[in-house]
Structure formats: C-alpha cells, structure tokens
Amino acid sequence: MGRTVQDELEQIRAKGLFRSTRLIQGRQSARVTMEGRQLLLLCSNNYLGLAEHPALIAASMAAAEQFGSSSGASRLVSGSMEPHEALETAVAAFKRTESALAFNSGYAANTGIIQALVGRGDVIFCDRLNHASIIDGALLSGARLVRYPHNDAVALAGLMEKQRGTGRCLIVSDGVFSMDGDLAPLAELAELRRRHDALLMVDDAHGCGVLGEQGRGSAELLGVLSHIDIHVGTFGKALGSFGAYAALSRELRDLLVNRARSFIFSTSLPPAVLAVSTAALELVQAAEGDELRKRLRDNTSLFRGLLRDAGFFLGEGNTQIVPILTGGAEETMDFSRQLLEEGMFVQGIRPPTVPAGACRLRCTVMATHSPQDLTWAAERITHIGRRLGVV
C-alpha cells in the first residue's frame, strides 16, 4: 500500500513546512483586520495601493453593467470582447511593442508562453532563481533546460558558447526577483540574445507599474525596453487588478494564440477585470502614478535603511521587496508569529519557495504605508530579531 494523504501531511508538518491560509476582513489596505485585530500589512504585492482605488472600482462596476459578468468561454470559442481588445492595445502602447496578449494569471502566462515557443530540439537558459512558473513551463516544454547561476551573465555566456545548439534558443529571467528583490542584468542578457540569435523573455511581475520613469518596469529602468522579445507582466500586483500579459511582436502573438495551451483551453478573463487593468495602466502613466511611485521609493528607502542600520542582512536588492534572511523554517515562522502578536502581518517564506537554509521574512513596502508605520515596524522587527538572535 502506498503512502496516504495523512502520511504526506504529517511529513510536511514534521519538517516545519505546513502551510495554511489566513482570513483577513475588508480590503488589501496598508492595515487589515484579521481575527478581530487590526494589523499592519507588510506582505501584500499591492505596491501602489491601487487594489482599493476608486477609479479602478468604478471601471469594474461600469464594465460589469455594460458587458456582463463573464466572457463565456475561451476567446477562440466565443470570440474576443471589446474589453479584451482595449486592454491589449493599452498594454502594447505601454510596453512599446507591436502587440500584446492577455492571460488569466502570471503562472498561466509563463507556462503557456514557454511551451508555445520551444520544444524538443530547442534549449532554454534559465536563471536559477526564476519564478516557479518559469521552471514549470520549461520542464513541460520538452526543451533542454540549462539553469545558470543567479544573475551571473559571465557564467551564462560560457554556457551559451558550449550549449547553444542549432534549435531555437530562449533566455528567460525574472526582471525583479520575487524573493530577493534584486534586478536581473538585462543589458547583459540583451547582448547575449543578440550574439547568439536567441529570444529573450523577461517576467517583470514585480517591476511593472513600479520601476522606470513611467512604470514600464525593469527594462525601462535599465534602458533595454526594445531589446526584449517577450515582456511578461501581471495586473495583480502593482496594478491592483488580476491576470497577466505578454507584450511582443504580432508574429509571436499569432504563435501564442495558436500554440499556448493555457490561452487556448481557458475561459478568458471577465470584462470587469479587463476594464480594471486598462484603467490601472492609464493611471500609472499619469501624474498620480508618478506620485505613487515616488512615495513607494521613499518608503522603501526609509524601511531598508532602518533595517540595514539595525544590522539585518537584506540581500543585494533595493526594490520594494525586502527580504530579512533568517535561516531555518522553524525560526522563521516563530519570528513571523511574534510579529503577528505585535500587530503586523509579515509572511515567513520556507522551502520549496526558497532553498533550505535560506528562509526569510519577505516584507513588501506599499506606497500607502505611512513613514510612521514603517518606522514602528522596523523598530519591532529589530526588537524581536535581537531577542531571537537573528541580528
């Protein structure tokens, strides 16, 4: 007899890796209510606070009234609706590409795109710390997967010289790495793309709306917007909506429409969600978007500075994702529980999300946090961190 579900759950618990969801009441604000207590929220990806913006809520209600509550089927079955076309036109203009295609989630985008682009006889060069959806898409594609050391363009160059092969070649990287908050070396990746006649795909889920002069992401910040073949991003983080996109050439879009299984075999996003995403893109490019990004930068600088001054190791990044390296799973979750008792919700991150021994508190800063919120949070994190011997 094989292992039971109960056996598997007991093994997960024994390793200190059991997970469960927590119920919060109300919106994804800077402060939330959980089990009757008000908490400072320091683990949401709602970086600009748009998830509760009146303009986005109004766009949702208007679209539902005009177009109904559902898209009905896959777009290849029952057709695209006007909100699909409006959003994809807005995404292409935002990312300065010929075309764009909406997906139901970032996971669906990455798995579908990679499987559509490469297969047996092709090769994928993939950063070791890329998001799980990229790894899963690469494994499902059947292409040869070559994983290079994190952000090491020199090592990647050597691997490409030896293992490029003659098939289609795809370089894929996060733009901002979700667990470390550091940036990919996109200029170097773009040069390797040119040198080896490769496609370059960048998942900028955590840079979209936040980085660059108009929030176009890490590629805009680093000056390589036009050197990336497939820009992937999400509407569900800084843009305060749901779903994802690929911004790319018309030819590549046509290929995805015909080959990306996660697009072909899924009922598409509903009109209300599409309208929210379109409204968010307009907002982040306006003066209000500039102000929100500045507020987020200022908040991030304040919070990171306070924690660094206290002696915490925060890795190499300088974005709104602030990892506090803690070590083991049990210590990390104890730290998280004590912070919850103090009045803040900070998520502990354990394997398989991060490697064993690299557990962390993943703090995320929002534009809607006040300086007083972040100063208080840093003080309490420091107090508990010293008590636990983390710093």
Swiss-Prot record:
GO biological process, one term: biotin biosynthetic process
Binding site for substrate: R19, H131, T353
Catalyzed reactions per annotation: 6-carboxyhexanoyl-[ACP] + L-alanine + H(+) = (8S)-8-amino-7-oxononanoate + holo-[ACP] + CO2
EC number: 2.3.1.47
Transmembrane segments: none
Any one GO molecular function term: pyridoxal phosphate binding
Residues bound to pyridoxal 5'-phosphate: G106, Y107, S178, H206, T234
Subunit structure, interactors included: Homodimer.
Family as reported in the entry's similarity comment: Belongs to the class-II pyridoxal-phosphate-dependent aminotransferase family. BioF subfamily.
Protein name: 8-amino-7-oxononanoate synthase
